[in-house]
Structure formats: C-alpha cells, structure tokens
Regions:
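Generic structural signal for short, solvent-exposed loop/turn connectors between secondary structure elements
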Residues: 1, 124-126
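Extended amphipathic alpha-helical scaffolds
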Residues: 1-7
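Conserved mixed alpha/beta catalytic, RNA-binding, or beta-rich assembly cores of soluble enzyme
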Residues: 9-86, 90-100, 106-114, 120-124
Length: 126
C-alpha cells in the first residue's frame, strides 16, 4: 500500500476544495474532501461499483452517514460515486466543507469544484 496521500486543490477562496486520496493498490480508495472557511468532518459516503443489471456499463451503490445537522454528506456521496465509477474500486469519502452564509450558487460552485478535483485526480492516473 502506498502510504502517501495524493492531494489536489481546485477553486478560489473561499470556495477552494481540497481532495486527499489514499490509494490501496487497486483494493479501494479512501478520500477526504475539505474546503471553504472551516474544514471539518460532516459526512461519510461509501461507494461500491458494480455492473449494471442491463449489462451496459458500470453503476454503484452509495451508502451515507452524516453528522446531524450537516449537509456535507451530499459532497461525500458525489465524490465517492465519481471516484468509484472512474477507478472501478470501492471508495470511502469523508467530507467537511463550510462557507458562512453560502447561497445556493455558492454551494453549487463548491460541488462543481469537488467534481473538478476528482477530474484532476482521475486525469493524473491516465
């Protein structure tokens, strides 16, 4: 197992997202998504990839666990699914993102930055 986490940062403050990925040599990924003005642990998602029932590609099942009152699990699930489908591995993501008084547009930007960080990671693996 590679003990070095790979770190990717996307976006401008206060909407910066950092993705840290720990690889296990093809046996799963563990990732931590933080950002905004107050990184923390707010939610966890586990994505398990599997073949689609129609045989046309890959899908995944995503389980979620959130800290009460936190919505970070939505970012965790989004990133876990994208990583699982991109890497064809089981993925566990912990997320904690906070921006004071974030608007709907601010939250959308944070989510887009999280997906962009996943894209940067996946492209680094190509």
């Amino acid at each position: 197992m590679n003990n070095d986490a790979r770190i990717f940062t996307v976006g401008d403050s206060p909407f910066t997202i950092t993705l840290r990925v720990q690889e296990t040599n093809g046996r799963g990924l563990n990732a931590f998504v933080t950002g905004g003005t107050s990184p923390h642990v707010g939610g966890v998602a586990l994505a398990v990839p599997r073949d689609r029932s129609d045989g046309k590609g890959l899908t995944c099942d995503v389980s979620q666990l959130c800290v009460p009152g936190h919505k970070d699990v939505e970012a965790a699930a989004l990133v876990a699914k994208a990583l699982a489908l991109g890497m064809h591995q089981v993925v566990c993501v912990t997320a904690g993102i906070h921006v004071d008084n974030a608007s709907g547009d601010d939250i959308a930007l944070l989510m887009q930055n999280a997906l962009s960080a996943v894209e940067v990671y996946l492209n680094s693996r190509a």
